[in-house]
Amino acid sequence: MKYLCQWGTAAIMLMAFTADGQSAPPLNQHPVEKTFLFNQLPEKITVPVSALQSIFSVTVNSNIIVSLGTQLKIEGSVIAKVAVTEDQLSMNIRCTNYQNALLNISRITETDGSFSYIGRMVSLQHGDVLLLWEEKGQYSFIRQKQLLAMVE
């Protein structure tokens, strides 16, 4: 019994020292603070559906100027227009008036023949992003920090 108690004490001490050795090293990297590209825009910009529909009439390599609401005007060129599936058409627009930010917007055909839209405008050199949201039948661009949005 005496040896069992000594072996138990040694095992507990060994586990304690091993567990202490497993602590993670301190993180010395901090996220890079980037300037904001869309800080002159409001937090939420209402977008009429007609403006979103007009974007999809433009062809690849064409220049585009479209007002997405009263506070957001897009100027740039269509760099890609791809039918991802038979129900989803996606476009990439390089926005020259927003330091070559990329506007990716998709039109999804619903089963009843109506359309829904999703999208985002992002620049990897800046710390914010505009996300296109649909809420209660109304579309809006919402400004968020880029840390909160996934960028491929």
List each model region and its residues.
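N-terminal prosegments of processed precursors
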Residues: 21-152
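Long, terminal "pre-/pro-" and other extracytoplasmic accessory regions
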Residues: 5-6, 20-22
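N-terminal signal peptide c-region/cleavage motif recognized by signal peptidases
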Residues: 16-18
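Sec-dependent signal peptide recognition
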Residues: 2-10
